[in-house]
Structure formats: C-alpha cells, structure tokens
Amino acid sequence: MGKNRKSKRQLVRDEKRAKKREREIEHEEERDIKKQRREEAQQEALAPAAADYVPPPLDGTYDENAFSSAPEGRRGPNTNFEREFFGMLAEEEQEYFRHADELLELNDFPSAEERDIFLQNVYKEMRGKELKLASSQSCSRLMERLILLSNTRQKKSLFDAFGGHFISLVTHRFASHCCEKLFLQSAPVVTQELSGEYEQEPLPEGEEETEAMKSSMEDLFLLTLDELEEHLGFLLSDRYGSHAMRALLVILSGRPLDQAGTKSLLQSRKKEYITVEGAAANASELSSQIRAVPSSFTMAIKKIIDDSTATMDATALRVLAKHPTGNPTLQLLLELELTMFGKNKEKKDKKQKKDDDEAETKKEETQSEISLLGMLVPDAPAAFADNTTQAAEFVNSMIYDPIGSRLLETLITHCPGKIFKGLQQHIFGPRIQSLLRNDIACYPAIRVLNRLSREDLADAVEKSLPEMASFVDKGRFNVIKTLFERCNVRNGTDEINSLLKALTSAYGNDWKNIVPKLCMLDEEVSEEEQKPESTEEVGEEEAEEKKKQQQPKFQTQEAKNKAFMLNHGSQLVAALLTIPGQPSKAIQSSLAALKPAQVMKMATTSHNTSSILIKALQTPAITPTFHKVLVSSLLPHVYELATSQHGSAILNAIITLPSKPAEPNAPAVPFHMKENIISQLAQYERDLRETWLGRNVWRTWKGDLWSHRRHDWVRWAKETDPETARVAAAPKKREEKEKEEAEKKPKGYLGKNFDPKKAKGLAGNKKFEKKEVSA
C-alpha cells in the first residue's frame, strides 16, 4: 500500500495538471462560442443582402445548421443533407489495394496476359467495396486508374455502385475526383450508343448481368442528375461538388472534353494528373471533338439552369458572381444559356411581336427563358443608360472585381447584339481608354474590342493613342496586341500605322528597340542563364534533378510579374510579325539588328521567345537577306541549340525551309548554311545521342544519312526546294546543254576563238561567207 501512495510533490503536480486541463477546456468552449456567434453575425449580415442565400465557406467545410434560419422556399429543398460515412477498409485490404496501385503506376508486369489477369483479380476484390475505395485517401487514386482502364460494362457497374450516394460522393474530397473521372470517361459512350456504333462486351464467366449493365449510358446520366437535382443550389459553390457539376454540364452540352479551355474549366491548376499505362488505348476520339448528344441532355441543361437560379434572386446571384468557387460554375451556366438557347429565344421574340393581345404573357415566358441573363442585367439594354439601375450597377460593380470580371467577360462575349450595343454605348465606349489601363478592367474591355465594328474600333483606337506610353509602362501588352489584331481584321490600315507610330515613339522612335524591350533582351543575363542548356557531362535525369534543386520551391511575385510581361510582350511581337506592311517590317528590322548573343538568348530562354524566331523564319522577308542574317547569328552555337529545350525546335524548323525561294522574298535558307549546320552536328554526334533533345535533332536532320550516303542527304535536303529550282539544279545531258547554250548566244556570234585579223586575209573587204561542205 505504501508503494502505491503518492508523494506530496506528485499530488501537487497532478492538481496543477487537472487545473490546467480545466482551463484548456474552458478556453476551447469559450472559443467555440465566440466562433459560433461570429458565424451567426456574418450570416445575419449576409442574409438580407443575399436574399437568404449564403455560399458555403471557402475551406470546403459545411455546417448543417448554418442555413437553418433561412426560409425553406428561398434556400431550396434538402440543402442540408447529411453526409454518409461508408466505413474504412481493413488494414489487409488497404495494403492490397495500395500495392495494386503501385504496380499499375510502375507497370511492372512480365507480360500483358499477367497484367490482364491481375486487373481482373483487382476488379473482383473491389466488388462491394467501391464506396470505401473511392472515399479512401490512399486508395482513391487506384479507383481513378481502374476507371481509365474500364470497359463500358464495368463503368455501368460503377454507376450502379455509386447510385443513391452521388451527393455524398461528389462533395467528398477524394471521391469527387473518382466521380468526375467516371463522368468524363463515360461521356463518349453516350454518343456511340446514340449512333449505333457501340458493341456490347462479352460477359465474363461466373458474372451476372445487372440492370445497370442493360441500361443505356444516357439513362444512367439522367438518373444521376435526378439524384443531384434537389441539391443544385448547394453544388453551385461547393468546393468539390462544383467541379462535378461543371463536368456534367460540359458532358450534357456535347462540348469537346480534351480542349485546353475545357480542362481549365473543369479542374484547378493544383489538381494531380493521374494516368496509367494502357489508358490511351481506351481513350475515344470523341473526347477531342464535338459530340452528338440526345435531346434529353439539352432539356436537362435547361432544367439545371432553371432549378439552380430558382432559389435565388438577383442579389444572391451577385454574391455568387464574386464567390471564387461559384463564379466558374455561374460562367458555364450563363455561357450555355446564351449559346444553346439564345437563338431560339430571339426567334420566339420575333413571333411574339405579331400578336399584340398576348404580348404581356409571352413577355413573361421570354423572361423565364432567359432567367439567368435577365436576373443579372434586368431590363437591358435600355437600363444601361441610367447608372442607378440594377443592370448598370451590376456591370460597374463587376468591372474592377478580380473574380466578378470573369463573369462579365463571358457575358460580353456571348450576349445578344442588342445588349452588347447598350454596353458599348453607355458603359465601355465613353471610358474605354481608362478601362484598358487598369490591370483588371482591361480584360472585359479586351472582350469589348473583339466585338466592335470598324467605326467603333477606330474611335477606340483614337482614344487609346495618347495612352500608349502608359500601356507600355504598365505592361499592358495584351491590350496593344488586341488593338493591332482587331485593326488588321477590320482592314484599318491607317489605325495600324498610327498604333505602330505611337508604339515606336514609346521606345525612342527607333524600330530596333522594339524586340529587345518587349522580349527583355537588354537585361543582364544571370550566370545560370548564360550556361548552355546542355547535358554533356551528366546524364539527362541528373541534369533535370539538379535544375529542380536550383529552382526555388515558390516563385516570388516579382518573378511572376516578369514572366507575365515576357509572355505578353512575346505575343505582341509575334502578332506584329504576322501583320503585313509596316508592323512586319518593323519587327524584321529589329530582329536583324540584334546581336548574336541576344538572338541566342531569345532562342534558349523561353518557348515564347523561341517561337518568335521560328515564326520569323517562316514569314516572307521584307529585305532579301533577312533569313540569312538570322540564321548566321545562330551558326556558331549549333550544339547549344541542339541540346536546348527551346532552341532545338528552331534547328528543326530550319531544315524544313527551302534552299531557294519559290517567289521573291519567300522564306528560304541557303543550302551551304544547312551543310554548315549538319557538319557541326556530325562533330558532336556521340554527345547528341546521349540526350533526348539531341537525338531528336539528329533524327530530324537525318544525320545517319549524312554520315553514310551524303549524296542521298543532299537530294533529301533539296526536296523542300520549289520544283523549278530542283529541275534547274538536276544534271543534264551534253546535247541538251549545247542546245541551250546555242539558243542563248546572240545572232551572228562566230565563236569564242574567232580572230577578225585572220579573217581579213581570207575574205578581204568582202563579207565573210560560210562555205558549204560537200558530203
């Protein structure tokens, strides 16, 4: 008993610990109460402004009681759903699936047959555990890889397994990615079934065909939409559910799934790219093109737009327009409404004007059809004339907002002509020059420039000319590029010359300064940039690892701004190069005046600058020696170019150009320069073969052909020459040569060795006559 008795010191220590724990509990409770009060205060402040609709927090958390005070009619039915918990995988199961994921990622299988057997076993093991697997942090990647490898029958069985739980899955951090992958991979099947090209896969032995396998993919998508229908208002701004909703909208509309614009709409930049060996074989060509979709999908889009906005008024939509997660979804809804239902709406409007008696009722129907646009800008375009109206206030509040301006860009791009004319006349037109100066408002203003008529564009250019120096100082090169391109499209030669004159004056009234300033060639090159991008001494993988270690983990804001300005400046140079006349001449003069070190910096620094040189080589020359001067600046650095990520593309472009121009000033590189390049490449053949970029250049230039059969290489290199030049360079017979030479000689020509003094003794003062030689 004495051993178990605590000492006085221990009792005092335990008492202190107990008091400390009590204080911590009280502090936590007090903090929770304050947090709850703060959330309630924020909700009360936003509730009247947002008409009882408040988007969920940005961190993805969702409080089931956060909307309890809002009326049921305004917040939509069953918004406060209870998320399901599907349980956790056992340790043995988790280890098995994790090992399977590693094997699929490494593709470490002795043969394709063993890989197929392994996949079949994984599918069998996964049966009945799909929900646990999809919501598992460590195994959801395996589910995505299996979806990429699944056939149509297996995808339908996954729809069956996920059915009834989609709302919990699409709002889950990990399962939402699996749902998106399933939706996107199943979209081409709808088109195949619609066109009759789909063939049912044979059922494996011992497996029964379920109702989902018998159903069409169209029905499975519609059943999924029915399940999500009650929660559309919540999914608009949910951190994970909004991505799944965007994916469904893109699928229903039939838009291409593999386009860059579609991918950026569906996923964030931080999204992990998951793939697996064999996924490309299962990929459908329909993903990269516009797909035919059934009429039920079009009706489903219309219903989604109506249901999503039915629970909100105009004020709630404005709150959603500035929400980081809800804004992209709202953009897509607005774009689909204007592009898919806009033309039908205009036709109905014309028919409605015929009947005066039913005008009011039909006007209400029209407003219901354009619910989203009508709620954002009511009574447009007439309302834009008064700055106090709801429509004008909405546009003015979105112009300078970094998130809301994106929705405004979509509205400007796709809105009907009447509404755009009102926007241009009353809001953007009078202050276009000040909007183009602003770093946020310039993007909606650029969208306006893309739709202006020739007269309005000339007026905008006239207002913008005094601001050219300000555009250059602030780096608004995208604005200058748009002005040049639109004037070129509208055939505004005078406006183009005025813009070029203003741009040149901003750079010291000298064309030679344009390219160095826009491409930042005047700045001192750091020691790291001066080193050639070669991997001569170390392997390619080691060089890449060393490069990654040298690069900072997080890019500073200054570096981001510099890269941003370099990108837009290079795009402006490339745009000017394609505009015939003075702009192209100015850029070619500036490129020809560059020093060899500056040309090499352009060739190896970035993709944007190297693409300028490629485009310059493919552009007709204003001066005959332009292409020759440009290539001669690169000749001393052929090996550095061949092992450079960006410079290798320039070498590959040079060999595709003809040696003799088909027309005067057409793109061409003299043949002796090509021979100089291939001879330098041959000196470094061994080093080139050690790198992927070097092998690519050697293969493109047909280096092996040069080494073993040089006359064949010469014939191949001259295949790009125009036909007349190749015929002229071909060897001819002796008789044909003599005949051509005789035709070229002037009449009365007596030959190269004819001596008139000797002819005097033979003929005297008489004319020289040719004697006939008898047989």
From Swiss-Prot:
It is found in: Nucleus, Nucleolus. The keyword Nucleus applies. Pumilio repeats lie at residues 125-160, 161-196, 227-267, 390-425, 633-679. The keyword Phosphoprotein does not apply. Residues 11-41, 345-366, 732-746, 766-775 have a biased composition (Basic and acidic residues). InterPro entries: ARM-like (IPR011989), ARM-type_fold (IPR016024), NOP9 (IPR040000), Pumilio_RNA-bd_rpt (IPR001313). One of its GO terms (biological process) is ribosomal small subunit export from nucleus. Its main location: nucleus. Residues 1-10 have a biased composition (Basic residues). Keywords: Nucleus, Repeat, Ribosome biogenesis, rRNA processing. Residues 1-79, 345-367, 525-557, 720-775 are annotated as: Disordered. GO terms for molecular function: RNA binding. One of its GO terms (cellular component) is preribosome, small subunit precursor. Belongs to the NOP9 family. RNA-binding nucleolar protein required for pre-rRNA processing. Involved in production of 18S rRNA and assembly of small ribosomal subunit. PANTHER family: NUCLEOLAR PROTEIN 9. This is Nucleolar protein 9. The gene is nop9.
